[in-house]
Amino acid sequence: MTIQQVLLLLLLWMWLLHPCRTEMLFRRTPDLRPKGFVGRTSGSDGKALHRQKRGWMWNQFFLLEEYTGSDYQYVGKLHSDQDKGDGSLKYILSGDGAGTLFIIDEKTGDIHATRRIDREEKAFYTLRAQAINRRTLRPVEPESEFVIKIHDINDNEPTFPEEIYTASVPEMSVVGTSVVQVTATDADDPSYGNSARIIYSILQGQPYFSVEPETGIIRTALPNMNRENREQYQVVIQAKDMGGQMGGLSGTTTVNITLTDVNDNPPRFPQSTIHLRIPESSPVGTPIGSIKATDADTGKNAEVEYRIIDGDGTDMFDIVTQRDTQEGIITVRKPLDYETRRLYTLKVEAENTHVDPRFYYLGPFKDTTIVKISVEDVDEPPVFSRSSYLFEVHEDIELGTIIGTVMARDPDSASSPIRFSLDRHTDLDRIFNIHSGNGSIYTSKPLDREISQWHNLSVIAAEINNLKDTTRVPVYVRILDVNDNAPQFAVFYDTFVCENARAGQLIQTISAVDKDDPLGGQKFFFSLAAVNPNFTVQDNEDNTARILTRRNGFSRHEISTYLLPVVISDNDYPIQSSTGTLTIRVCACDSRGNMQSCNAEALLLPAGLSTGALIAILLCIIILLVIVVLFAALKRQRKKEPLILSKEDIRDNIVSYNDEGGGEEDTQAFDIGTLRNPAAIEDKKLRRDIIPETLFVPRRTPSAPDNTDVRDFINQRLKEHDSDPSAPPYDSLATYAYEGNDSIAESLSSLESGTTEGDQNYDYLREWGPRFNKLAEMYGGGESDKDAS
C-alpha cells in the first residue's frame, strides 16, 4: 500500500467521523432542571437531533466558534410543558449578549447567534430564560439560568515572544550542551483536544544544533565546534500545535547563536627567523623592532607574554610586551659597538598568559623564534678615555706649564686623527689652552687660588675629517695653595691709651688673617719691628697678641698719637710676614679707664652738626638752584605764534617777509644762491618717510650757465612728486617778495614755464589728500584768482 493510498483512507475516515462528533458535542448530560422546560439541541446543519424530556439537563448549550455560515447560527431550543402551541406563551431571554449576540424566537423558543463568536475572546456566556403568558404577562415557569459554552477549534497558531533570539555557547562544547530555551504560546484551549499542544522542531541549523520537542531547549549536536572555523550560526525553530500532527498550525522564530572563544589555540610565530638592524649609535632604550606571534583566539585568550630565553645578546637587549597590540618590542639594554660585535642572536619565546587546563592535551601554548640583530656601523664621534678628568696644580706654576692631558680615540674601524679644543664659554678669562693634536692642557695666564680655587673646563674632541661630530668631556682643575700671602691685621684697630695708664696695662688685643690655607692650619707670630720704650707686644700663641704699656703716664699735650709697627709672620714655607702699624691715641680717661677726650684742642672746636642736619641743608640748596634755573629758562623762552595752524603743513618751512628794510638780506631764509653751488646739488633726494636701503654717494654735476641749474632742480623735484603722489612734499616753500637790493641769484624770471597758468589744470591736486591742499591753493587758484583780478 502506497503512502498516497494511506493518506486517502485517513481523510475518508475523518470525514465519516465528523457527524458523530457533532452529535456528541450537543448531547446533554443528565441533571435536574426546572419543571416544564424542554431543551432541544441541533447540529451544525440546524436540524433538531432529539427532544429532551423533563428530568433531562438542558441548562448547557454548546456552540462552535468561528461559524462561517450565511444564516444565524442555531444554538438550541427552549420549550415549556405549558406551551400548547397556540402562541399564548412568550419566551424571554436575558443575560450575557441577550438581544445582541443571542436572540430568541418568542413563540418557538429557538435561540440563534447573530455573529461569529471567538472563544479566545470569551469562552462561555451565562443567560436567563423565562416563559410568560402573553396576555397576562405573568410567568408560567420560574426564571431559569443556563450557559452557552463555546467549543474551541484550532484557529490560532503558536507564537514566540521574540522574533529573533540571541544566544551563545562556548566553542569545543560537548554534544548536548544547552544553548537557550525558546517557548511558544497558543491562544487555543489547552483543555480541549490538541489545539494548544505544541511540539518544537528545527528547520534550519542542523546538524550543528538540535531542539527538544516538548521543552524547546536548543542543544549542541556536534562535538568540538571550532570558533576559528565558524563563529556565527542561524537556527530556525518551528512550534506546531495539534501535537505536531498534520493539519496543525505553526509559527517560527530565529535564533542567532555565537560560539564564544576558549583558549584552544597556542601562539604561533609566522617566521622561524626574524632579522633586525640597529645603528651602533642608538642610545640605551632605543626600540629596535617589533615581533608578533599570531593567536587565533580573541580577548584574554590571545594575550601573549614575550621573553628572551637564550642567545648571545641576552645582556644587551630587552623585550617588552605591548598589551594593546600584543607585540614584543625589542630595545637596547647596553651601548652597542660595531667594532666590538656586529651580530647578535636571540631566542624569543611567546606564551599565552591565560591557559585553560581543559585543553592541555592540544599541546604547549607557546612558541619560539630566532631573532638576529645586525649592528650597523656609523661615523661615531671620538670617545674619551675617561668620563671626566681631574687635574691638580699649584698656583705658583710658570706660564705654559702642562697641567694634564686628555686622550680620545676614533671608535670607527677607519681611525681618524682627533682635534682637541676648549669651550671658551667655560674659560672666559682664557687662563688655559689646549694642544689641538695631543690634548695637553697648559696655562696661558697666572693662577691664583685666592681668586678661584676651581676651574671647570669643557674639552671638545672632533675628527679632523668630520668636525661636525664632536664629543665633550668635563675637566676639573683644582688650584693648590702655596704660601704666597703674608698675614695681616684681621680688622682696623682704633687703639687708645689713657694718660693715667700704668706700666704693663693691656690696651689692645690684636689678631691676624691670611688668605692662604695651609694643610696644617694657620699659625701666626707677633713681634715688634724694633724695641719700643712705650709699648710692647705679648704673643698669646693662639693667633692673637696683647699690646701692653711699658711705662706710667702719657700726656696728650706732648704726644697725642703713637705709631707702633707690629710684625706678623706665619709658619708655612716659605715664611711670609708683614708689618702692620697700630695707631695709638692718647686720651683723657676717668678713674675707671673710660675714655673722655682724645684731642688736645677739643675744647676750642665748635659744636658740630649732625648728619641729618647736613643732608637737609644740602637738599634745600639743591631745590633753590633748580627753581632759579627753571625761572631763568622760562624768562628766556619766547612764545612764537605759528603762521599756519594746519596739521598737514607741519613739514613746511615758511618764513614771513612782511617787514620793511633791506629786503632778502635781512631775512633768515636759506640763500637761493646755494642752488647754483654744484656741491650742494644732489642727484636724487630720498623721501623722509622711507628708510634708504643703500647709501648713495653724492655725484657732482657740471653747473649750467645762468639759471639753468635752478630750472633743472625744480623740474627734477616736480617730476619726483608727479611720479609718486602719495609722498609728502620734500621741498620748502619760501615767498620772495622783496624790496631793496638785487638778488645775488639774479632774476627768477627764468623759472617761468612756457605756458601760462591758465593752460594748466591742477584741480587733481585736491584729490591727493590734505597733504597737497597747499599746492592745490598755489597752482589751482581757479575762480578766486579771477575774482581777485
Swiss-Prot record:
Glycans are attached at N256, N438, N456, N534. One of its GO terms (biological process) is cell-cell adhesion mediated by cadherin. Pfam families: CADH_Y-type_LIR, Cadherin. Cadherins are calcium-dependent cell adhesion proteins. They preferentially interact with themselves in a homophilic manner in connecting cells; cadherins may thus contribute to the sorting of heterogeneous cell types. Keywords: Calcium, Cell adhesion, Cell membrane, Cleavage on pair of basic residues, Glycoprotein, Membrane, Metal-binding, Repeat, Signal, Transmembrane, Transmembrane helix. It comes from Gallus gallus (Chicken). GO terms for cellular component: adherens junction; catenin complex; glutamatergic synapse. InterPro entries: Cadherin, Cadherin-like_dom, Cadherin-like_sf, Cadherin_CS, Cadherin_Y-type_LIR, Catenin-bd_sf. Residues 635-789 are cytoplasmic. Residues 55-606 are extracellular. This is Cadherin-10. Residues 23-54 form a propeptide. Residues 55-160, 161-269, 270-384, 385-487, 488-606 form the Cadherin domain. Three calcium ions are usually bound at the interface of each cadherin domain and rigidify the connections, imparting a strong curvature to the full-length ectodomain. It is a single-pass type I membrane protein. Residues 1-22 form the signal peptide. It comes from the Eukaryota. It is found in: Cell membrane. The chain crosses the membrane at residues 607-634. One of its GO terms (molecular function) is calcium ion binding.
